[in-house]
Amino acid sequence: MIKVGLNLGNSKLSCIVTDYKNSDNINILSVLNYPSNLIKKNIIINYEKLLNEVKNLIIESEKQSQTKINSINVNISIVDSLSKYYQSEIFISDQQITDLHLKKAINQSEYFGENENNYELINDIIAYDLDKKIIHTDPIGNYANKIKLYFYKLLIDKKYLKNIFNLADDLKLNIDNLIPSPLSSALSTLSKDEKSLGTICIDLGHSTTSTAIIENNKFIFGDSFLVGSSNVTNDIARGVSTTLSSAERLKTLYGSIISSPSDEHEIIEIPFISGENDKFTQINRSTINSIIKPRIEETLEIIWQNIKQNNLHNKKIKNVVITGGGSQLEGIEEYARMIFSSNVRIGKPLEFLNLKDNFYNPSYSDIIGTTFFEKD
């Protein structure tokens, strides 16, 4: 089965074409990235230009994969989304649980409630309570006096989605699934055990940072905010008065969150912000790292506070996977361990995939994960 994923990001457009057998057998036929700056904060700057860029991306993907693209999974940014938890309970007088009991509990819940301004990107049962015993598998066949269902709902603005649907219509493409971007990243980077036992997956992207929490193979929390690796680049450019391209180079080659005594003595030559070829100044490596560290600290603290606000810190999840381009900053694993008091690793696309070496890179986690998504 051919599965196609499309990502409309703030800095790039991406398309992946796969021959999908199952989650353990995926052959990647094509992965393409086009630089683009036509989407900012979930707002399309120029619809016609974006339409043309996506059209060219699809055409080139068809050529590379030798496949006709008719339908797509779309990665959806969840900036300004709303996470909501709700529950429903019924009494069944120690009967054996049937499908009808579950349907009754669902029907009397908020599951089918309409929302005028928001679209339900995720609306799922995440746990069952049978007489105060929590289970995460289908309860049918068990006996109970009282059944309680716990739900998780992720809502996003309908206006943003309307543009996505219009884009697909104009390109004559069907949308199979809309996938929260952090969930895509988690699906491509987490092992089976990590998804079962509970893991916080953090994607440090170009313009956004996104979080997904997976536990008992369920997506139980998603969040995203407008701080990314480009903010680190901007901080460096302002902090040392250099060009953005020079700041990006400094971040990539010398950036670290963990300081070393030798940083004071490592001197780096950088151009002035004017960009004149013959005008340079010198800084030491510790200056760069003193700029990077507060931004990363702030970003990780925001994630942790958002998790606490949703009372998910009580789950005491001890696994954190950091992916996305920003995850390649030296020292981020060690620093995240201190923030989250957890095991931390850098997440790359899973190794069993048929990928060229350069795609086993955290920057590709979100687009590759779009083809892993399957509705229950």
Where in the sequence are the language-model features?
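Nucleotide/phosphate-binding catalytic cleft detector across ATP-hydrolyzing
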Residues: 1-12, 16-199, 218-220, 243-244, ...
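Extended, charge-rich low-complexity interaction segments
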Residues: 65, 205-215, 365-376
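A short, acidic, amphipathic alpha-helical segment used as a generic capping/interface helix at domain edges
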Residues: 298-309
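A short acidic Gly-Thr/Ser loop motif
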Residues: 6-12, 77, 201-208, 214-217, ...
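Glycine-rich phosphate-binding/hydrolytic loop that grips phosphoryl groups
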Residues: 345-376
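Glycine-rich phosphate-binding loops at beta-strand->alpha-helix junctions
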Residues: 258, 315-339
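Residue-level signature of catalytic and energy-coupling elements of molecular machines
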Residues: 15, 74, 168, 203, ...
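A conserved active-site cap/scaffold subdomain adjacent to cofactor or substrate pockets
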Residues: 226-247
